[in-house]
């Protein structure tokens, strides 16, 4: 479930500011916005004080993209005539379930396999199976893929290869 971008205001300028902040691209995966990723948690605009408070949650603790995202939020706010305060909240921890459907589509169209849904926690014993995960190739649609390396071009991606079209591709890891 994507976490909503919230805030209240009746005028267009803050809505434009919210939209501009939500449209900031992730520097490590520049086809998805911070809203698509679900890391943009809240945008609160104070028109009188000309300030905006933005709450973000990193995809993982120590994510190097967060400094660039914070700087970009501050730049966008200044461009709109606002001072920005950007806060990072680690709890609840970000999950790939917060990726929007549009974000998943953008990843796939860019050649990155989007993550599957996480398993839900249940208060009882669960059975385990030793079956390989089925990851669909974003290039040809085959599920005959294999993991080449658990560590891809960024910490949030793994490197895979399609056994049908033989092309390598990134997989966005499910967290």
Residue ranges and their predicted role:
Residues 1-175:
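Domain-level signature for proteins that mediate thiol-based redox and metal-cofactor handling
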């Amino acid at each position: 479930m994507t976490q909503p971008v919230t805030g209240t205001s009746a005028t267009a300028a803050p809505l434009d500011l919210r939209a501009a902040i939500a449209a900031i691209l992730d520097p490590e995966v520049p086809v998805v916005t911070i809203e698509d990723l679900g890391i943009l948690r809240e945008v609160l605009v104070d028109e009188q004080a000309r300030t905006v408070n933005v709450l973000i949650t990193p995809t993982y603790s120590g994510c190097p993209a967060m400094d660039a995202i914070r700087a970009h939020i501050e730049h966008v706010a200044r461009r709109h005539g606002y001072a920005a305060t950007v806060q990072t909240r680690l709890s609840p921890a970000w999950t790939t379930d917060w990726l929007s459907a549009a974000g998943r589509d953008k990843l796939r169209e860019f050649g990155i396999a989007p993550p599957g849904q996480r398993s839900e926690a249940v208060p009882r014993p669960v059975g385990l199976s030793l079956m390989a995960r089925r990851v669909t190739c974003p290039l040809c649609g085959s599920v005959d893929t294999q993991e080449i390396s658990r560590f891809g071009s960024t910490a949030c991606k793994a490197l895979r290869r399609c056994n049908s079209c033989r092309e390598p591709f990134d997989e966005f890891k499910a967290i």
